[in-house]
């Protein structure tokens, strides 16, 4: 048990003082008036600001490393950099690339998550940004690798990492996109609209499918 004291705590939309934070394990267990708890290791944060860690759900890389490197040391470097800047967990985000390259990246994320205890921000899973997007809104994605939404292709990509994808960016105006979104939702994957040329009406329809 650890007690964080003498900090400026962001709570209920405002910065507050005169409060202590009780930490049990890796979670905030309680927040009470200063001096409520007498037992436990007390850490004086000397007036620093205390706020919940950020969760970054869309990040391809940082500090010279990229998720598509498909290397655990790259993920370690990204995680360490994020933690040093207030982000405590993140979704490793892939780019539109060849199927083997996406598979390699997802496999590396899976191995990293199942491996030894790591320092830095925690990887919660993967965010697949593409390849099921609109080539007319490709941005930095490789146009030659963009493909229509397809359940079989997704299952091929994730055959060895079936539970690693937590979020999918999808262009809902593409053929079969809504059926594909229903399939992803049934698997517990959050679907987000992105890299799209969808109209307002198409977006409203997509929202009715849980996107």
Where are the predicted features?
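Divalent metal-coordination and catalytic microenvironments
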Residues: 7, 21, 26, 47, ...
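Short amphipathic alpha-helices and their capping/turn segments at secondary-structure boundaries
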Residues: 40-41, 46, 105-120, 204-208
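N-terminal small/glycine-rich loop or linker at the start of catalytic domains
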Residues: 49-64, 127-139, 175-182
């Amino acid at each position: 048990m650890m007690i964080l004291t003498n900090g400026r705590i962001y709570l209920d939309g405002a910065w507050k003082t005169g409060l202590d934070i009780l930490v049990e394990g890796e979670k905030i267990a309680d927040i009470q008036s200063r001096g409520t708890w007498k037992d436990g290791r007390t850490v004086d944060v000397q007036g620093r600001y205390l706020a919940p860690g950020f969760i970054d759900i869309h990040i391809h890389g940082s500090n010279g490393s990229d998720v598509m490197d498909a290397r655990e040391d790259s993920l370690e470097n990204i995680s360490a950099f994020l933690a040093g800047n207030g982000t405590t967990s993140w979704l490793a985000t892939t780019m539109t690339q060849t199927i083997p390259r996406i598979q390699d990246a997802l496999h590396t994320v899976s191995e990293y998550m199942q491996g030894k205890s790591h320092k830095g921000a925690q990887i919660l899973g993967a965010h697949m940004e593409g390849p099921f997007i609109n080539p007319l809104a490709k941005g930095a994605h490789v146009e030659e690798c963009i493909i229509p939404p397809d359940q079989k292709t997704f299952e091929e990509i994730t055959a060895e990492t079936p539970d690693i994808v937590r979020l999918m960016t999808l262009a809902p105006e593409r053929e079969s996109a809504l059926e594909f979104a229903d399939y992803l939702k049934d698997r517990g994957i959050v679907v987000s609209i992105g890299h799209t040329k969808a109209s307002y009406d198409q977006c409203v329809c997509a929202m009715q499918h849980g996107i």
